[in-house]
Amino acid sequence: MTTAFITGATSGMGRAMAIALSDAGYDVYAAGRSQAALKDLQAERPGIVPIAVDVTDREALEAVLADITIDVLINNAGIMPPLGNFADMKIADIDTTLEVNLSAAILLTRLVVPQMRERQSGHILFTGSVAGHAAFSNIAVYAATKAAISGFAAALRADLSPSGVRVTEIVAGRVETQLYQDILDAKARAAMYASKVVQPDDVARMVVAVLALPAWADVTRFDIMPTWPTSPSGTK
């Protein structure tokens, strides 16, 4: 059976992907920091193996991965610091965002890649963002991490393509997750939900479809965005 290891699996897209892959027959290891959330996830899908771990803790990750053969790695863990002008950001918030969103994904990938390359198979996915491909105010460091993830995924793909290991970047925009709930004020949330939003399950279904493709089909990146409201005249 195919084994998938997913970080940031306690909420949002990560949780949806864990459930969807479990339903599709994968052995799923769901990693996250909240033991309570992991317990809830396992109660909903008893076949999922919960892994309580901080993705920035190298020794803990090495211990967790020591006895697991991973076919699919989904680097989904991420945070968004408080919205605001870069000049006003706290240094601690900058450090934490870089560590969780970028360094942890690179570290985990480095720990898993050797076994995939040795087997000449595997699939690594990264949760990117539209913010990594377009400029938005008040999220400079978050955008930098997502742009870096995009670049890393592309370069990693070039490194690994001769070995048959595939790499896919997930570019999602305006997804209804707790992350957005946490950072937006009431007015911003109202504006966001007045238009259509992508659901975590939508992203999860795409991931299952991409992973089901034959070895000769390589989805290097997929974008999933909401359809925008249409005016009575038919223009967007």
Please identify what each model-predicted range represents.
Residues 10-11:
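Conserved glycine-rich cofactor-binding loop
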Residues 109, 145:
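Active-site helix of classical SDR
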Residues 129:
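Residue(s) in the substrate-gating loop at a strand-loop-helix junction
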Residues 51-63, 91:
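The beta1-alpha1 cofactor-binding region of Rossmann-like NAD(H)/NADP(H)-dependent oxidoreductases
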